[in-house]
Amino acid sequence: MSRNSLWISTFVLLIFCSHIVETKGQRLPVPDILKATSEADSTYLPDFSFAGYHNGESAIPVSAGTRIHATDYGVVPNDGLDDSRALKMAIKAASTLDGKVTLQLPAGRIILSDILYVERSNFVIRGAGTGANGTELHCPRPLMYVKDPVELTELREYLIEFDKRQREKENNIDLPFSQYAWSGGFIWTKVPNTRVKSYLQKYDKPPTVLANIASGERGDFVIEASAIKDLNVGDIVELQLFNKEGKRGALMFGLYKDQVAKVGSHHWNFPDLPLVKQQVEILKIEGNTITINAPLTIAIKPSYKAQLVAWKHLEEVGIENFKVTFPKAPRVAHHVEQGFNAIYLTRVYNSWVKNVIIENADSGIITEEIANVTMRNIVTQGENHAHYTVMMQGTYNVLAEGIKVYNKAVHPLSFNTFATKSVYSNCEVFVDPILDQHSGANHQNLFDNIKVHVAPNSDRSYPLFAGGGAGYWKPSHGAFSTFWNIHVHFLDGLDSELPITLNGMKDGPLARLVGITANHNVQVFYEPSAYIASINQVLENVPSLYRYQLERRLK
């Protein structure tokens, strides 16, 4: 090749490469809803970036503090004998130590048949990993064979008093609900002698009120108090909003924007039960003006009788690096689960669960009354038909990311009662997926960058957005719940050019669905008054709304 020819070839190559760089360097447009400047309901998008450990602003710690070894208290892996007593002794010993403490579990199989209660802050249960040479907690029998937990006394009475039963005439089933259908776990965080969830009014006790709140705007961090008592900067407290005005109370409009025909009776039959709760840190107090660390989900009106109350909780609790296994067991019926539940998180704040595999569970992780928690890299698998995998119930600013669901479950990913401003991000469901929103005043939650594997129905539809929950807690969710960059991998139905319909939701007001794509054209139906955009368009520019909002906030 002549020098002149070589120069021409190089010049052409440089032009081609510069074109590629220029193309790749172009700023791709962001979805229109991210450009909206108005606070109008039609385009309002919550800021979900406050979800997770320390509002997503700090990495989960790796330092162990004082490390104690379970083997020093009698745990012997791989010997086929029960280790429950030894594990409880190790946790008791940890409770006597000051500062950060890590209970290190050995590699191998550890047998657990009783509940391990975690009742202190700054405590981590850590295994050796989830691989072949990691740690396995094997639970050979369900919680139904454990002594009835005193913490579930109120729930047990409620189930009996209200005759809560699973009735399936076609299957000859008429059985009482299990106390473990949505509660309890073999690893159980709790504040001693503290109620977690309200079921019966006779157990109600007046909270410690620290401030009465008169007003505040949606999305703001500043609230105005009418009275303040014993409230200090740095306090972690609970903001509560009530409906004391009956069936047509103003808070119903705040939650559902008058978009649904039927609102369940629990919204007005229990006027002393807060329908909206946020666990927040007090950043500043100037006179009657209070600044909190996260934005309000709903504008506060005087009729909501809003208040800040003391909130008992644990902090800096970690559960990580092990596998929990249960034996194969036949499924009896929905709500009649025996109690193969791995982890029950209650009343924890700025805490985490990470790198855990859960096999053959009825429910992998159940939550109640938790905030600013990250659940990361959790795998659920097995042959048993689960109720829940990693569920969100009574959550605020909770992040579940990297969840992989390989097993069949009634509610694979679920925002349940009182889940608020919480996020499933970068998750994948391989079997019968449903992005469940389970009623109970859950609102402003986000399904973010989710992949699901679907076998569509014979009519070329699939109820991906089906909402569960009891009628007395309907509708399925409040305004502004969001689906962002949802990718559907259809397993069949690809032999026709007709679009496949994704549906299932008829009582989910003002949802946001942006970037629903598949390996086949889809159409989306979601009611009522949903904002639907970028269907069949991959959101390469903003694949994760949570990450996009977090990065912008932390700039």
Provide a role label for each language-model segment:
Residues 9-18:
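Bacterial N-terminal signal peptides
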Residues 192, 202-206, 210-213, 367, ...:
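Extracellular beta-rich repeat passengers
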Residues 274-280, 284, 290-305, 309-320, ...:
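Beta-propeller domains
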